[in-house]
């Protein structure tokens, strides 16, 4: 499901929520475009397996970033650790199981909705159908390259 949260003050439009992933990833290109100070990157040696078919990659560090879902009158904010992925993707970031757990979020894949508790009731975030299809096509093209 492709969503558009605010991450570290930036409204991102292609963030994949993937309940099958054990990590939150942010891609090097996204970090560069967000202008994040390189001194905030923590050294990590985490290895990714299964993110890109047939490849194994080592992250280039990690960042603690604030993620916000909802509207100005009913929102949730959580600080999540993101591992910096050294490869390309059609997405700007990937939120895994830890994000689902921290936000107490429940995905509804058939209707492309993500629901979570907020201070003023349930927050419902709609997924972007067009972006979801494009992201899937892009991932398939990247897999075919390798």
What are these regions (language model features)?
Residues 1-12:
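A short acidic-Thr-Gly-centered motif at the start of a beta-strand
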Residues 15-17:
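Short hydrophobic beta-strand that contains or immediately precedes a catalytic carboxylate
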Residues 19, 23-146:
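Aspartic protease core domain of the pepsin/retropepsin superfamily
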């Amino acid at each position: 499901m492709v969503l558009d949260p605010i991450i570290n003050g930036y409204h991102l439009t292609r963030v994949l929520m993937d309940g099958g992933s054990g990590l939150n990833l942010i891609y090097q290109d996204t970090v560069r475009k967000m202008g994040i100070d390189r001194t905030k990157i923590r050294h990590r040696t985490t290895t990714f397996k299964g993110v890109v078919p047939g490849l194994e990659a080592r992250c280039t560090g990690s960042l603690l970033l604030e993620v916000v879902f909802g509207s100005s009158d009913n929102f949730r904010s959580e600080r999540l650790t993101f591992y910096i992925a050294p490869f390309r993707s059609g997405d700007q970031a990937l939120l895994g199981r830890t994000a689902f757990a921290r936000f107490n979020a429940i995905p509804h894949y058939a209707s492309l909705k993500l629901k979570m508790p907020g201070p003023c009731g349930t927050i419902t975030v709609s997924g972007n159908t067009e972006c979801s299809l494009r992201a899937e096509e892009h991932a398939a093209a990247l897999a075919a390259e390798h």
